[in-house]
Design a protein with these regions (language model features):
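Hydrophobic faces of well-ordered beta-strands that scaffold small-molecule active sites
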Residues: 67-69, 85-87, 137-141, 204-206, ...
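Aromatic-rich peripheral "rim/lid" segments of glycoside hydrolase catalytic domains that contact
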Residues: 163, 200, 210, 215, ...
């Protein structure tokens, strides 16, 4: 009976995909039971209460699968059957201190702002083909240093310093915060769904791994409560700008796998346990007037260089676990059930917006990576609080500390030019299809399970 229900669920998903993504006609076989047929018709043709033709009031999409990817090659991503996509946006590149031939002039907050038209067009080329296929697009909002002092003075947090990859947004000065609001307003309007030529964005991830801010959201040395306060200003500004154009667009806080632990070798003024940071952020948000925000978590294994995440020792089932990795995702789901963290009496939603498994350079490397993905997929499928698993990476990247996380290898001598597909590629394609159960039986003895049902929900 369970197998039959599973087949019917997959059939419903496929029919809805045919209708919404491929624009193919619905085909209901004569033997399909009445309840299943009714479910398909209701899901596909009767929108949720309150839905309207106006893009602003459309509800947040509920795609039939959690499968997602940080996309490098759009056509390949679509062929893989993804329903969620992550796209990086470098706000420093979008902002222009002075006009040139490609400038877009944008009026907001009583003044004119200059946007990099060429960069905006490059974002369109990534976002539009994905959203046209019904894929839910999430953007990761980042501030990379440009080495242009005038630009960086506006965009980067003035306390940022030392060696870092990404800076915190400049929420410390009036000019910086106004500029940030204008940039988000520009993007929110452009990708609101009113302009088919640009595409649509539904999810807005603010910064990157802010609990480990020294490297990934540099605010300089400051106590955790001050860092949470600065970050709250950026998230609130994002939410307010997005909601001007989308009643149900979502904003997300970005955290890495350190839960009660924190980044080793870094001071407690530059890295913080996620749990403490989250509680402080929520307190500040309530104090200033609560608003809707959600979680974008990165559950990498304990050791990013070891794909055997099922063996993670620092990921326990305790609320005091040092890490939250793939192995113990339920800890985060349970923690968000605390009433003081709720929004509208419901737990905040979770997406897994960046994570992958390293491919070892030995004869078992590809098999271990693929087996790890099978374990991850089965684990995520059982977590009802998680909406999306957005895999990282599409293609190996030469400047990622020696990690090889891709579905594709990169060509030797290139940074990220695709070379060949790994074993994990076909497994990823088969996820959430009727090919999946047979494709992952090889992984059970590798991860030490007799059945996927043995995975803790």
């Amino acid at each position: 009976m369970a197998d039959e229900q599973h087949k019917q669920d997959l059939f419903i998903k496929q029919q809805c995909t045919n209708i919404f993504r491929e624009r193919r006609p619905m085909r209901l076989p004569a033997e399909l039971n009445t309840i299943t047929a009714f479910a398909i018709v209701c899901f596909c043709f009767f929108p949720a209460s309150g839905a309207a033709d106006d893009p602003k009031s459309q509800p947040f999409p509920q795609p039939p699968s959690k499968k997602g990817l940080q996309v490098q090659m759009v056509d390949d991503a679509i062929a893989l059957g993804i329903h969620h996509a992550g796209i990086n946006i470098n706000l420093t590149a979008l902002f222009q201190p002075a006009a040139n031939d490609n400038t877009i002039r944008f009026s907001y907050d009583g003044r004119e702002w200059l946007m990099n038209g060429a960069y905006a067009a490059s974002l369109d080329n990534q976002i539009r083909p994905l959203s046209e296929k019904g894929i839910v697009v999430y953007v990761i909002l980042l501030a990379y240093p440009s080495r242009d002092p005038a630009r960086d003075a506006v965009m980067l947090h003035p306390n940022a310093g030392g060696e870092f990859t990404i800076a915190g947004f400049n929420t410390a000065s009036d000019d910086g915060l106004r500029t940030y609001r204008a940039l988000i307003a520009f993007l929110a309007e452009r990708y609101s769904g009113r302009h088919a030529e640009h595409g649509r964005v539904w999810g807005w991830i603010v910064g990157n791994e802010v609990n480990s801010q020294k490297i990934w959201y540099n605010l300089g040395a400051m106590p955790m409560k001050d860092a949470a306060s600065e970050y709250e200003k950026a998230v609130r500004a994002t939410h307010d700008s997005v909601r001007e154009h989308s009643d149900h667009g979502r904003c997300y806080l970005s955290f890495d796998h350190f839960w009660t632990g924190r980044m080793p070798g870094v001071s407690d003024q530059e890295s913080y346990p996620t749990r403490e940071f989250l509680v402080e952020f929520a307190r500040i948000a309530r104090e200033r007037g609560d608003f809707e925000w959600h979680i974008a978590h990165h559950p990498y294994p304990d050791d990013l260089g070891n794909p055997r995440t099922w063996l993670d020792k620092l990921a326990t089932l305790s609320d005091d676990s040092p890490h939250i990795t793939f192995k113990n995702l339920q800890v985060l789901c349970e923690y968000l059930k605390k009433p003081e963290l709720h929004w509208n009496n419901q737990p905040r939603r979770i997406i897994l917006s960046e994570q992958g498994l390293h491919c070892l350079q030995n004869e078992e490397g590809e098999t271990l990576q693929a087996a790890g993905f099978a374990y991850v997929w089965e684990k995520v499928a059982r977590q009802h609080g998680i909406d999306a698993l957005i895999w990282h990476r599409h293609v190996d990247h030469a400047h990622e500390g020696g990690l090889r996380l891709g579905l594709w290898t990169n060509k030797p001598g290139t940074v990220s030019e695709p070379d060949r597909r790994r074993h994990i590629y076909e497994l990823f394609r088969k996820a959430d299809t009727d090919e999946w159960p047979a494709a992952v039986t090889f992984a059970l003895p590798i991860v030490g399970l007799e059945s996927w049902d043995a995975i803790s929900p």
